[in-house]
Amino acid sequence: MQRICVDMDEVMADTLAEHLRRYNQAFDEDVTTDDLAGKGLWEIAPLDRQAQLRAFLDAEDFFEVLDVIPDSQQVLESLSTRFEIFIATQAMVVPNSLGPKYRWLQRHFSFIPPTHYVFCGTKSILRADYLIDDQPRNLTRFEGQGLLYSAPHNLEVTGFVRVNDWLEVADYFARVVSESKAAI
């Protein structure tokens, strides 16, 4: 059975929406995802706000209240009947996110067993056939087929197979299944 690794933040969990909500509330701003086309929030926030940006991520509740990216649950559950699904998240970048991320996955993706959660510091350790991720640097180091999941910060990035939403992910893997059946 082929293996798909899936990033959590900005692919399954809407981390950016929560980060923007807290940023806008704390600084009385109205930054939108449109303002971030080709950039990350860290790139547009003034230097004197960088520590607070990090503090938002370090908040105990941050990773527990994230919205689910539309269609991710249904598509991943469907894919799990034909592929081995692993969730790979760089939780070590925000160490106190491990518990909240675990609980979030249990609550929203209970069909994926905890033995298929990979909490890591670098995704270069992953060995799978596919990786769905919003960070180009993770796909560059990946030895299988990388799929760049669209997010405001990566809209100008080229050189990867791009998927804009979970319905495009479903279509991509439907073609993979169809091609593998045709090859038999």
Model-derived features: positions:
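Active-site neighborhood of HAD-like aspartate-dependent phosphohydrolases
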Residues: M1-Q52
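Non-catalytic pre-domain segments flanking phosphatase-related domains
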Residues: M1-V6, S178-I184
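Short, basic/glycine-rich phosphate-binding loops at helix/coil junctions
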Residues: I44-A59, F83-F86
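Substrate-recognition element of Asp-dependent hydrolases with the DxDx(T/V) motif
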Residues: F63-D67, S72-K101, L105
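A structural signal for isolated positions on well-ordered beta-strands in alpha/beta enzyme cores
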Residues: E84-F86, Y130, L147
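Membrane-proximal envelope and lipid/glycan-remodeling enzymes
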Residues: F86-S97, E156-L167, D171-A183
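Substrate-recognition "cap/lid" segment bordering the active-site pocket of phosphatases
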Residues: A88-R141
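Acidic, Mg2+-coordinating phosphoryl-transfer loop and its flanking beta/alpha structural elements
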Residues: I132-L167
